[in-house]
Amino acid sequence: MAKTLMIQGTASNVGKSLLTTGLCRLYSRRGLKVAPFKAQNMALNSFITPQGREVGRAQAVQAAAAGTPLRAEMNPVLLKPLGDSLSRVILLGKPWKTLRAAEYYRERPFLWSAVTGALESLAPDFDLIIVEGAGSPAEINLKADEIVNMRVARHLNAPVLLAGDIDRGGVFAFLYGTMELLEPEERALIRGFIINNFRGDPSLLRPGLEMLKNLTGGRPTVGVVPHLRDLRLAREDSLFLDEGGMGTPKPGLVDIAVLRLPGMTNYDDFDPLAAEPGVNLRFIDSPAELGPGSTLPRALILPGTETPLRALGWLRERNLAAAVAACRDLGVSVAGIGEGFRMMGSFVRGVSGEGAPESPAGQAEPPGQVDLPGQVHLPGLGLLPMEGRFDPEEGKRLLRGLTREGDEVRGYGVPGGWVPAPGDEAPSDGSAPGPMPEAGSGKAPPGAPPAPEAFLVLEGSRAGGLRSADGRVWGAALHGVFDAPGFRRRWLRSLGWTESGSPRDREELQRREFDRLADHLEAHLDMGLLDRIIGI
């Protein structure tokens, strides 16, 4: 059976995920079969297993670091926040229920059985399971119902390392205070501390480390981990934006602006663009950030979102829908990924309950279509002649396909999710399906430009994306299209980008970053002590 180690933290965003990732890499390099595990994750950034199950992106990164295939059991409960205390619950990789906080807590006994079952499934297949906690184990108002911190540690009898981020200030108070708020049997599981994200001379910490050891019954600090600069690994949700993802145009660079939609998912879709020399990637949430005509971005991107109907309302409330249309008319390329692609349609159809407005009074319904109970039908952005469809129960899966230019793309998403606008022919053969509607309104003006073509065909001959005849407006159903260097660079060249060097292999870059992180931890943790704590 597998040995276990658990990483808990004094608060959110103290580095638990990165520490878990680095340790997965470090021990897998020693020849151990390592699995990451997080009982419950709350995140909009997700990934799909080879079996088509959805898990948190952090666990996907950790599994890649460990060199093991991703499994739904590594993150049995994924909460995708929708706002207003409402979350979509993904259970063992499949959509389960949409619940409010009080409803969720009533389901904890059932969810705990899923957590323990997942651990039982993983244990025979691995030598070491590295478990990540969530937030703090000392949230005394939540402890009675938690299924992700000390309850997991007690179930596994796992040794726990408690991590604190010294860059936040007050790290010794955080560590000691957390210990004091734990029950005696919980404190007994804490075997040591990690001080993360240190900048400066570690010798200055010695008096504090000694006092912490004395105050906590001789528990050692397993390591003081210095800040690691420019680590290029996928992060959870808005942390990237909080740490500088918002920016301004930079002279001499191809400027690409991503609309920061409510419920935005898959931030790492755009990492390959940001990594290209000569590209400035930024996130915006107001028309003012687009700048006057001479400083408009070369491209706007509508990303994926867990709440697409709400995002449409948000775009209109902020006048961003009109701004996108105006930018398109001024020659700015407009692209959509996943749900962002489906929002580009003449109309969108979805299920009420995510905070979307009802269908506007007097809004014309497409001929022959009747809304089912609980559905809403709204005008889309009108950038492409299709109807986007959103179903919270829809299943995402791994997808691959070819563009018309022969570029192979791989990723994941909903293979359907859209149909040609009523009266148009299906564009699966790339033929013109009808006039392009007026951007932002859902209406098709007379004399509209030539209609789009299906530029991406998925396995099974299903169209996976549309683009306008001039190529400036396009959308793709799958996340991960920018990982394909041929497709990515072809599009960047159309924006005026000058190619510099050969395309970067994202998987190779990721492997190097995993090793850099593992080397960093190996150099700054007491590995002999850590091995003894784990029992290996």
Predicted regions and their residues:
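Extended, hydrophobic alpha-helical segments
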Residues: 315, 322, 328, 353-357, ...
